Curated annotation (Swiss-Prot):
The keyword Calcium applies. Is regarded as an important allergen. On the 2D-gel the determined pI of this protein is: 3.95, its MW is: 11.39 kDa. Gene3D superfamilies: EF-hand. It comes from Merluccius capensis. Keywords: Acetylation, Allergen, Calcium, Metal-binding, Muscle protein. Ca(2+) binds at D37, D39, S41, F43, E48. This is Parvalbumin beta 3. The modification N-acetylalanine is found at A1. The keyword Acetylation applies. Residues 24-58 form the EF-hand domain. Belongs to the parvalbumin family. In muscle, parvalbumin is thought to be involved in relaxation after contraction. It binds two calcium ions. GO terms for cellular component: cytoplasm. One of its GO terms (molecular function) is calcium ion binding.
Length: 58
């Protein structure tokens, strides 16, 4: 779903960066949130989640 937005290496690095316990980074979260929240409503609607694969939403 992010093939046109992010490189595969960037996606893998992001997933690895948050795999450890207590590794939450709010700045990174909000960058990701801004990409997913396509209508800038402040919420991620079901339609916006449809752009993600099943693996990305688990």
């Amino acid at each position: 779903a992010f093939a046109g937005v992010l490189a595969d290496a960037d996606i893998k690095a992001a997933l690895a960066g948050c795999a450890a316990a207590e590794s939450f980074n709010y700045k990174t979260f909000f960058k990701f949130f801004a990409i997913i929240d396509q209508d800038h409503s402040g919420f991620i609607e079901e339609e916006e989640l449809k752009a993600l694969s099943d693996a990305e939403t688990k």
